[in-house]
C-alpha cells in the first residue's frame, strides 16, 4: 500500500504526484483491475494462451 506523508512547505499537487508514483510502482491499480471481476480458470487459460500467441507472432516479425 502506497503511503505518502505531506512534507512541510510541500504543495498538495506534489504529494499527490508522489502518491500516484508509489501506487503505480507497487502495482496496486493493476492488481485491482485484475481482481475486479472473477475470471473462470478456463477463460484465464484461454486469455493466457492468446496472449502468448500474440507475443510469439510479434517476435516473429
UniProtKB/Swiss-Prot annotation:
| Gene Ontology BP terms | translation
Task: Read off the Pfam families from this record.
Answer: Ribosomal_S21
Q: Which cysteines are joined by disulfide bonds?
A: none
Q: Which UniProt keywords apply?
A: Ribonucleoprotein, Ribosomal protein
Kindly list the GO molecular function terms attached to this UniProt entry: structural constituent of ribosome
Name one cellular component (GO) term. Answer: ribonucleoprotein complex
Specify whether Signal is a keyword of the entry: no
Q: Where is the signal peptide?
A: none
InterPro entries noted in UniProt: Ribosomal_bS21 (IPR001911), Ribosomal_bS21_CS (IPR018278), Ribosomal_bS21_sf (IPR038380)
Similarity field = Belongs to the bacterial ribosomal protein bS21 family.
The record ties this protein, via HAMAP family, to: Ribosomal_bS21
Task: State the name under which the record lists this protein.
Answer: Small ribosomal subunit protein bS21
Organism, as annotated = Leuconostoc citreum (strain KM20)
Amino acid at each position: 500500500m502506497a503511503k505518502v506523508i505531506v512534507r512541510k512547505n510541500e504543495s498538495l499537487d506534489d504529494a499527490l504526484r508522489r502518491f500516484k508514483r508509489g501506487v503505480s510502482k507497487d502495482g496496486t491499480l493493476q492488481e485491482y483491475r485484475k481482481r475486479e471481476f472473477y475470471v473462470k480458470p478456463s477463460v484465464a487459460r484461454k486469455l493466457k494462451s492468446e496472449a502468448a500467441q500474440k507475443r510469439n507472432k510479434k517476435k516473429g516479425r
